[in-house]
């Protein structure tokens, strides 16, 4: 039986992620883990996250799980969700007062930046709002096993003010337009991550999690 560890470092709605994974793959053993051993013993790892990046990185470091996450990213299938995707990169412009940026895990080259949409209007004449909250389309930038069974430009659910700017275009797996075209999914080797929330994205989100459970990078 495949064991999936959802990393619990005290931030994020882990229950909805766990429920979605169990619904997508009832044959898998889905565990919410808060100790390094739980990550090391798992076959696959999900790194969720929500809220402010400084708080997330501080909580991950304080939890004692950061090194285990980095170790897992070297060899195990890993899925990052929302801020969990952003944490995979080198730094974020979402920082505490008096600092320019927050150092992140550095598993993928690039940075996290904020939407700058002041004064911009949507096609219907309304102003863009930050954070983006709601459904939006994801354009698949390239084929990937996790896109299997998911039509291009399917709708997924977003809640975010920041997004990743990948340094290597080959790492971009999906893009979305919200005032600007931004990266909404990334992939490298055994890592896949999304800015949107699969657990809030109905059938297509469950299909994405189902593909992750059966993915053999």
UniProtKB/Swiss-Prot annotation:
<dbReference type="GO" id="GO:0004359">
    <property type="term" value="F:glutaminase activity"/>
</dbReference>
<keyword id="KW-0456">Lyase</keyword>
<dbReference type="InterPro" id="IPR029062">
    <property type="entry name" value="Class_I_gatase-like"/>
</dbReference>
<keyword id="KW-0963">Cytoplasm</keyword>
<comment type="subunit">
    <text>Heterodimer of HisH and HisF.</text>
</comment>
<dbReference type="Pfam" id="PF00117">
    <property type="entry name" value="GATase"/>
</dbReference>
<dbReference type="GO" id="GO:0000107">
    <property type="term" value="F:imidazoleglycerol-phosphate synthase activity"/>
</dbReference>
<comment type="pathway">
    <text>Amino-acid biosynthesis; L-histidine biosynthesis; L-histidine from 5-phospho-alpha-D-ribose 1-diphosphate: step 5/9.</text>
</comment>
<dbReference type="GO" id="GO:0000105">
    <property type="term" value="P:L-histidine biosynthetic process"/>
</dbReference>
<feature type="active site">
    <location>
        <position position="199"/>
    </location>
</feature>
<feature type="active site" description="Nucleophile">
    <location>
        <position position="82"/>
    </location>
</feature>
<keyword id="KW-0315">Glutamine amidotransferase</keyword>
<dbReference type="GO" id="GO:0005737">
    <property type="term" value="C:cytoplasm"/>
</dbReference>
<protein>
    <recommendedName>
        <fullName>Imidazole glycerol phosphate synthase subunit HisH</fullName>
        <ecNumber>4.3.2.10</ecNumber>
        <ecNumber>3.5.1.2</ecNumber>
    </recommendedName>
</protein>
<comment type="function">
    <text>IGPS catalyzes the conversion of PRFAR and glutamine to IGP, AICAR and glutamate. The HisH subunit catalyzes the hydrolysis of glutamine to glutamate and ammonia as part of the synthesis of IGP and AICAR. The resulting ammonia molecule is channeled to the active site of HisF.</text>
</comment>
<keyword id="KW-0368">Histidine biosynthesis</keyword>
<keyword id="KW-0028">Amino-acid biosynthesis</keyword>
<dbReference type="GO" id="GO:0016829">
    <property type="term" value="F:lyase activity"/>
</dbReference>
<feature type="domain" description="Glutamine amidotransferase type-1">
    <location>
        <begin position="3"/>
        <end position="217"/>
    </location>
</feature>
<feature type="active site">
    <location>
        <position position="197"/>
    </location>
</feature>
<dbReference type="InterPro" id="IPR017926">
    <property type="entry name" value="GATASE"/>
</dbReference>
<dbReference type="InterPro" id="IPR010139">
    <property type="entry name" value="Imidazole-glycPsynth_HisH"/>
</dbReference>
<keyword id="KW-0378">Hydrolase</keyword>
């Amino acid at each position: 039986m495949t064991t999936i560890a959802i990393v619990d470092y005290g931030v994020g709605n882990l229950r909805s992620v766990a429920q979605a994974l169990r619904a997508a793959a009832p044959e898998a053993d889905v565990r919410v883990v808060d100790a390094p051993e739980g990550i090391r013993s798992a076959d696959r790892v999900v790194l969720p996250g929500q809220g402010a990046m400084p708080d997330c990185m501080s909580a991950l470091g304080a939890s004692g799980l950061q090194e285990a996450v980095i170790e897992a990213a070297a060899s195990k299938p890993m899925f990052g969700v929302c801020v969990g995707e952003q944490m995979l990169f080198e730094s974020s412009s979402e920082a505490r007062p008096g600092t320019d940026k927050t150092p992140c895990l550095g598993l993928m080259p690039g940075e996290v930046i904020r939407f700058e949409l002041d004064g911009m209007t949507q096609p219907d004449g309304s102003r863009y709002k930050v954070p983006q909250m709601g459904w939006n389309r994801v354009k698949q930038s390239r084929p990937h096993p996790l896109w299997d069974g998911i039509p291009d430009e399917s709708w997924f659910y977003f809640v975010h003010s920041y997004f990743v700017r990948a340094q290597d275009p080959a790492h971009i797996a999906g893009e979305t337009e919200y005032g600007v075209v931004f990266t909404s999914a990334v992939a490298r080797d055994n890592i896949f991550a999304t800015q949107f929330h699969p657990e809030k994205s109905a059938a297509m989100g469950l299909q994405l999690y189902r593909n992750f459970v059966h993915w053999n990078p």
